[in-house]
């Protein structure tokens, strides 16, 4: 489970990065491209459905997959949809649902059983704004509350 803890930590860090705002022109596509590059740079394969409408980029069906190392064949993480909204001041707002489902699937290499974890990333009063320039993005994140709850565990198809 070491790989999954590392993945959760890297995902949480990327979702909640704090920095001072620096204003320059960014687009929603540049922010999404930065997220994809970051994850791909860590060895993940990233897939998603992208739909642009004006200054808004809706990203849904987000899935990241990685070879898991010596004990895990593959690990896949699926996440809910986000919208990246370009603002007139050159910043981009990241709009997430109040509850974002996260599904982690692990296929072992050994005789261990496959596992599936379902989580709910819940937040209220969330606001995330990305500023800066494409080479140096800064994230300003705030939320009244947020939590990550384990909602189900299946091992070899059996609810635990």
Model-derived features with residue positions:
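Glycine-rich, small/hydroxylated-residue low-complexity segments
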Residues: 25-160
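Gram-negative bacterial Sec-dependent N-terminal signal peptides
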Residues: 1-24
């Amino acid at each position: 489970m070491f790989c999954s803890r590392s993945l959760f930590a890297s995902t949480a860090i990327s979702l909640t990065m704090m920095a001072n705002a620096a204003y320059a022109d960014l687009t929603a596509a540049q922010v999404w491209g930065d997220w994809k590059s970051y994850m791909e740079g860590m060895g993940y394969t990233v897939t998603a459905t992208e739909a642009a409408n004006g200054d808004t980029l809706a990203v849904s069906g987000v899935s990241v997959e990685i070879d898991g190392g010596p004990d895990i064949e593959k690990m896949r993480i699926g996440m809910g949809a986000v919208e990246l909204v370009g603002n007139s001041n050159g910043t981009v707002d990241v709009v997430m649902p109040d509850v974002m489902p996260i599904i982690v699937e692990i296929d072992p290499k050994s005789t261990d059983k496959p596992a599936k974890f379902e989580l709910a990333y819940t937040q209220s009063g969330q606001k995330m704004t990305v500023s800066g320039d494409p080479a140096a993005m800064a994230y300003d994140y705030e939320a009244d509350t947020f939590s990550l709850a384990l909602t189900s565990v299946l091992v070899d198809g059996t609810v635990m």
